[in-house]
């Protein structure tokens, strides 16, 4: 389905611009993208829902129409950015993926006005051991040295996002392959494209969010907002299934749905870096849950 998007922006609490795309008509619904994505990454999902909802696709900081991360960036910052979009749009419906699923849950816990939220494979860590977040120091060093490919490898391995075969390949070989792919994209992408190289610095902040909420599952035990938990059946990062099952036990007002054949990136558009993209399979669940017309 081809739809027209209109660009806009709001100002977050600290003065940072938060850009967004808007399409459709009906009740306002905010779709918040995950790591290594931008608002555009959810264009297919937005298009599929645009006949029932006015869909907003914010760019989280550091990409697209939004301003940069600032020192002290935290989960609270992410919630404040979402709050600015919610206030502008009047939205009471929110969907988040992975780390943004955690942002959505925290927003529902701390902000008034979110009536329903859906979270796809929220990236919640059940303990604060640092096993999935202590890669950031190495990542920052590699990025500062201009070794973008190496930094991405560090992130993929640190988050357990790398395919099984990658885990047995030399880091140098993996980094060279990613560097070559980025150079090709740099040559061929239009000037306004949100390329992998532009996206790479944002990856550290996904770890910041996960680390901040690690071991804090009990925070959501009193959440009264209506929640839909979604996950696919394909294997994702090792911490995703335990987090899903723990939230399924703890959340007091929710239901959970397992979508056969989907993976961690399925809500976003299919691309070279997201071969499992299948927004058409996710949209019907969101439509039913948020109350759109069938």
Question: Would you name each region that the model predicts?
Answer:
Residues 9-71:
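Conserved HGGG/HGGXW glycine-rich cap/lid loop of the alpha/beta-hydrolase fold
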Residues 91-130:
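Conserved hydrolase catalytic core segment
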Residues 176-215:
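Hydrophobic, aromatic-rich cap/lid helix
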Residues 56-95, 99, 273-280:
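Active-site loop/oxyanion-hole signature of alpha/beta-hydrolase fold enzymes
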Residues 36, 60-64, 124, 261-266:
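Alpha/beta-hydrolase active-site loop signature
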Residues 223, 229-231:
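Short beta-strand/loop motif that positions the catalytic acidic residue
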Residues 253-294:
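Catalytic active-site module of serine/aspartate enzymes centered on a nucleophile-bearing elbow/loop
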Residues 236-243:
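Conserved alpha/beta-hydrolase "acid-adjacent" motif
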């Amino acid at each position: 389905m081809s739809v027209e998007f209109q660009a806009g922006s709001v100002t977050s609490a600290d003065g940072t611009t938060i850009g967004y795309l808007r399409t459709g008509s009906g009740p306002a619904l905010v779709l918040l993208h995950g790591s290594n994505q931008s608002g555009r990454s959810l264009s297919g999902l937005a298009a599929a829902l645009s006949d029932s909802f006015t869909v907003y696709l914010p760019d989280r900081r550091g990409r697209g129409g939004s301003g940069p991360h600032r020192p002290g960036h935290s989960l609270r910052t992410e919630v404040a950015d979402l709050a600015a979009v919610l206030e502008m749009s009047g939205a009471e419906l929110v969907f988040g993926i992975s780390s943004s699923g955690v942002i959505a849950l925290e927003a529902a816990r701390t902000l008034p006005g979110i009536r329903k939220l859906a979270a796809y494979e929220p990236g919640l860590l059940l303990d604060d051991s640092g096993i999935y977040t202590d890669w950031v120091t190495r990542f920052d060093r590699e990025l500062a040295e201009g070794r973008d490919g190496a930094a991405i490898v560090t992130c993929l391995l640190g988050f357990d996002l790398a395919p099984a075969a990658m885990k047995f390949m030399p880091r140098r070989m993996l980094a060279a392959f990613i560097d070559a792919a980025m150079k090709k994209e740099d040559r061929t992408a239009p000037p306004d494209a949100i390329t992998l190289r532009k996206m790479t610095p944002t990856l550290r902040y996904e770890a910041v969010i996960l680390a901040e909420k690690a071991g804090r599952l009990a925070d959501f035990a009193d959440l009264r907002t209506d929640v839909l938990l979604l996950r696919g059946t394909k294997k994702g990062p090792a911490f995703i299934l335990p987090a899903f099952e723990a939230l399924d036990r703890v959340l007091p007002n929710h239901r959970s749905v397992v979508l056969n054949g989907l993976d961690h990136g399925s809500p976003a558009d299919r691309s070279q870096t997201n071969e499992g993209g299948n927004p058409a399979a996710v949209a019907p669940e969101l439509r039913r849950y948020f109350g759109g017309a069938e």
